[in-house]
Amino acid sequence: MAIISMKQLLEAGVHFGHQTRRWNPKMAPYIFTERNGIYIIDLQRTVKKIEEAYNFIRDLSRDGGKVLFVGTKKQAQESVKEEAERCGMFYVNVRWLGGTLTNFQTIRRRIERLKELERMEEEGTFDLLPKKEVAHLRGEREKLERFLGGIKEMKSLPDALFIIDPRKERIAVAEGRRLGIPIVAIVDTNCDPDEIDYVIPGNDDAIRAVRLLTSKMADAVIEGQQGQDQPEEEAVVE
């Protein structure tokens, strides 16, 4: 069964690229035509590229690999959080903090501080402190939760990144490339596909398009997880 259909892609508006004056010539192989000043993405290429990305994520997940979902633009925030949580993976959906990957130990210390504040509140320590100090600590906890909540349980570097709009998330892309972490991304007509290992040519601005493509990557994770405990079938010798 096909992972995704042309009909689904069309209905979600995945084929709409950016205005022709805002394009990266490297995306030319993925462009079907131009209509009313907007590039139309070749969905036949998109279907194939989704399958490649899906298979990569599924196999990675089957081997116990972890994926970090990244999308901080408004159109992506909700989908990234919901789909990452649905498949039990990590996410960054508010702001990418520089060094999230390349300075991971420092980020881990901030996460430990977040967990410490959570413990203090759960254990009733806040009840023993002056109101002003409690307000300050709660503010600190909320800020840390906002930026780091999606990677709170990420004990080590991820095995792959799934990125919505690599142009906007260029710091995440740069960190992933520097560390040799494979990158899967929704790449619109204004992005550089050369920086991405698994390019999914598509509209990165429409909420429905982003949700559809993100959900497919989450499906790949889940399929991989379901295959983890199943031993491979032994070859039958005649």
Curated annotation (Swiss-Prot):
**One protein family per Pfam:** Ribosomal_S2
Alphabetical UniProt keywords: Ribonucleoprotein, Ribosomal protein
GO annotation, biological process: translation
> Which SUPFAM superfamilies does this UniProt record tie to the protein?
Ribosomal protein S2
Q: Which InterPro entries does this entry report, sorted A to Z?
A: Ribosomal_uS2, Ribosomal_uS2_bac/mit/plastid, Ribosomal_uS2_CS, Ribosomal_uS2_flav_dom_sf
GO CC annotations?
Answer: cytosolic small ribosomal subunit
Annotated GO MF terms: structural constituent of ribosome
PANTHER family (UniProt xref): 30S RIBOSOMAL PROTEIN S2 PROKARYOTIC AND ORGANELLAR, SMALL RIBOSOMAL SUBUNIT PROTEIN US2M
Tell me which family the UniProt entry assigns to this protein: Belongs to the universal ribosomal protein uS2 family.
Kindly provide the name given to this protein in its UniProt entry.
Small ribosomal subunit protein uS2
List the source organism.
Answer: Moorella thermoacetica (strain ATCC 39073 / JCM 9320)
| Lineage of source species | Bacteria, Bacillati, Bacillota, Clostridia, Moorellales
